[in-house]
Amino acid sequence: MPPKAGPTPIANGDQALTRSDFTTPEEVNEVYRRRARFYDWSVNAYYLIGFRWWAYRRRAIAALGLQPGAIVVEIGCGTGLNFRLLQASIGLSGRLIGVDLSTDMLQQARQRVAANGWSNVELVQARAADYNFPSGVDAVLSTFALSLEPRFDEVIAKAAMALVAGGRFVLLDLRMPDNWLRNLAPMLVWLVRPFAVSLEVAKRQPWKSLQRHFSQYSYQEGYLGLVYIAVGQQNEDEATGRQQTASWRAA
């Protein structure tokens, strides 16, 4: 029996990507290298199909329950689209750490930070699963990014260890719906393929990891079940126990 034909390559200048999956960090990085300069305005195209993505971002950030002076880590911060909303909550006495795989997206974020004169922002180029959270984090946010990381469970586990008592991890992302729209999966994935989403990525379920690592958990869906906001909150016993465990391991 002859071998099955591989996926059709797509010419992209520097390298050929495939139509199957953008799952490796290298492939995701390449997608956002090419999209970085135009990312901010390109995402607005989804308003044409009724996807009010800014409304979901605001709702996710509100769910963090931030106070002035808070330390926030944003995983997959991209060009820093969420920074203004986060800064409005934490103020200049707070600290904002933006983590992203793409150096090109981070360059756009640096320009945003400089233009606004934010002196409390630290930008880190790293794969999400390889990033080591600082201790004493008040909140962790990821919007439309964590599902692109195959090792998302590691990210959530590390975040749970770093969060203070009462600290929250808020996850806003796309998902495969559990309704009739599931039959339209190939078309739905096609709509978000420009942002490195594949069918395999869409089937990932990081909200279940959030539920597993946090005893306090809430979940809500929107946009016909295609988008969700999940919140995990660290209680005092968990925070104390996990921080002690981390100290023992480091000893």
Residue positions per predicted region:
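Conserved class I S-adenosyl-L-methionine
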Residues: D14-G65, L81, L85, Q108, ...
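C-terminal alpha-helical "lid/dimerization" subdomain adjacent to the S-adenosyl-L-methionine
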Residues: E26-E27, I49, V170-L226
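Class I SAM-dependent methyltransferase SAM/SAH-binding core
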Residues: V73-D130
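Helix-to-beta-strand junctions that scaffold the AdoMet/dcAdoMet cofactor pocket
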Residues: G91, E149-P150, L163-V164
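A short acidic, Gly/Pro-enriched loop at the edge of an enzyme's catalytic core
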Residues: A129-V140
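A short SAM/SAH-binding and catalytic strip from SAM-dependent methyltransferases
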Residues: D138-F152
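A short glycine-rich, Lys/Arg-flanked "PGG" loop and its adjoining helix->strand segment in the class I
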Residues: D153-A165
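Core SAM-dependent methyltransferase catalytic element
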Residues: H213-A251
